[in-house]
Amino acid sequence: MIQPQTHLNVADNSGARKLMCIRIIGASNRRYAYIGDIVVAVIKEAVPNTPLERSEVIRAVIVRTCKELKRSNGIIIQYDDNAAVVIDQEGNPKGTRIFCAIARELRQFNFTKIVSLAPEIL
């Protein structure tokens, strides 16, 4: 479960390393974000000499959460950390590589470009 003020790792090579969630896109009173949800975040740590800089406000899609994800067939998926992929306004990733395994549920939310860049789909 991701809520405002939650710190996230970045799972791509866009130039950001750490993010902090400041808003969850969706209903006005939405409290938590899960895998596949879009959040507004601020960059807390960035790689030097990249287009993304510290304190820049961006959009990101959640790809890993510590909160377990339960599927209808009984499988439970749980990650060790919270992570996101930086996206643009159209929903395309800003990076060209993704470094972690991605849950199959992202395909249902029309993030097919992120799924195609992932090295493994769980």
Curated annotation (Swiss-Prot):
One of its GO terms (cellular component) is chloroplast. GO terms for molecular function: large ribosomal subunit rRNA binding; structural constituent of ribosome. It is found in: Plastid, Chloroplast. The keyword Plastid applies. Its main location: plastid. Keywords: Chloroplast, Plastid, Ribonucleoprotein, Ribosomal protein, RNA-binding, rRNA-binding. One of its GO terms (biological process) is translation. Binds to 23S rRNA. Belongs to the universal ribosomal protein uL14 family. Part of the 50S ribosomal subunit. This is Large ribosomal subunit protein uL14c.
